[in-house]
Amino acid sequence: MNLDFIKSKIAAVPDFPKPGIMFRDITPLLADPQGLRKTAEAMAQELKNKGIQPTIVAGTESRGFIFGVALAEVLGLGFVPVRKPGKLPRATYSVKYDLEYGSDSLEIHQDAFKVTDEVLVVDDLLATGGTAKATVDLIEKTQAKVAGLIFVMELDGLGGREVLAGYNVSALIKF
């Protein structure tokens, strides 16, 4: 896999967005002509190693769109966007979830998946797991099955894996 390459393209930005936070910036990875493809290929290899065989990919707005579409292309699968409220034109399911300060919501079209679908959730970062769990809850409202979740990076020690206990969770890089 290309994990050393991927990790080398993620910039550490201290004290952003506030003092004491080490922000992991993916823009250098995306700016590299090989960055997105190598990341998607590494994700595909991780899925193969774990025996995860999704039938469709879902990505959470907004960076999950970037990596989700790239991975769907590598896997030869379709892609479904999980959106912020009010962005989808047809009937939707909605899930509200808590953030550090306040709450947010995510939506998905009610007909986004077939009951037989094995959905892979893709996003750039697993931290507390709130957004990922909301995405899982939306998928389960459609009666589809969650095949697994995969992230470019995981911030260890923030409880994301615990929130997603019972699901197959992978991250290419841990910080």
From Swiss-Prot:
It catalyses: AMP + diphosphate = 5-phospho-alpha-D-ribose 1-diphosphate + adenine. InterPro entries: Ade_phspho_trans, PRibTrfase_dom, PRTase-like, UPRTase/APRTase. GO terms for molecular function: adenine binding; adenine phosphoribosyltransferase activity; AMP binding. Keywords: Cytoplasm, Glycosyltransferase, Purine salvage, Transferase. This is Adenine phosphoribosyltransferase. Its EC number is 2.4.2.7. Pfam families: Pribosyltran (PF00156). Belongs to the purine/pyrimidine phosphoribosyltransferase family. It comes from Francisella tularensis subsp. tularensis (strain SCHU S4 / Schu 4). The gene is apt. It is an enzyme of class 2 (transferase). GO terms for biological process: adenine salvage; AMP salvage; purine ribonucleoside salvage. One of its GO terms (cellular component) is cytoplasm. Pathway: Purine metabolism; AMP biosynthesis via salvage pathway; AMP from adenine: step 1/1. Homodimer. Catalyzes a salvage reaction resulting in the formation of AMP, that is energically less costly than de novo synthesis. It is found in: Cytoplasm.
